[in-house]
Amino acid sequence: AQSMLDEAGWVVGADKIREKDGQKLNIDLLYNSDSVTEKAIAEYLQSEYQKIGISLNIHGEEEQSYRDNMKAGNFDMVFNICWGTPYDPQSSLAAMRAPVYGDYAAQLGLEDKAEIDQAITDILVSTDEQKRQDLYTFVLTRLHEDAVYIPLTYECNKAIYRSDLKGFHFTQTQYEVPL
């Protein structure tokens, strides 16, 4: 990462923060302060970015403020999760087309945002599985190439219940508990 920043003209200043054309390399990371996990990851990233000369300013906000700022695009970087099985990939992709989550704002700078949105719409209405697969490949490849999303972790759900409770199990999603 350091050599890539060097090649791009970002020089380490006296304060150990890189700068280019008089501009410091500062990035704001927004996280949900109600999430212990997000705070820990934000602090870790801040420490790691500092080692390569990037000032990562972390901002924890209570959940509603966090969500409002995500929708408005008031962030440089933000945490995001997908919904998982059985909702994805279609649910996460569908949500990218409207300003309801940070995805929409994060993608606004993409040259082919309209084409990506149309491909997502086509995925949702097509019954041709090969066409859908081709469209998924297009969308996910474009988002990967532009590094819009950087996978960091996968959080497992945990549950505690009494050992004498029989016939109880969890589904693949945290949103359903069969009774």
Predicted regions and their residues:
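Short helix-initiation/N-cap motifs at beta->coil->alpha
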Residues: 58-68
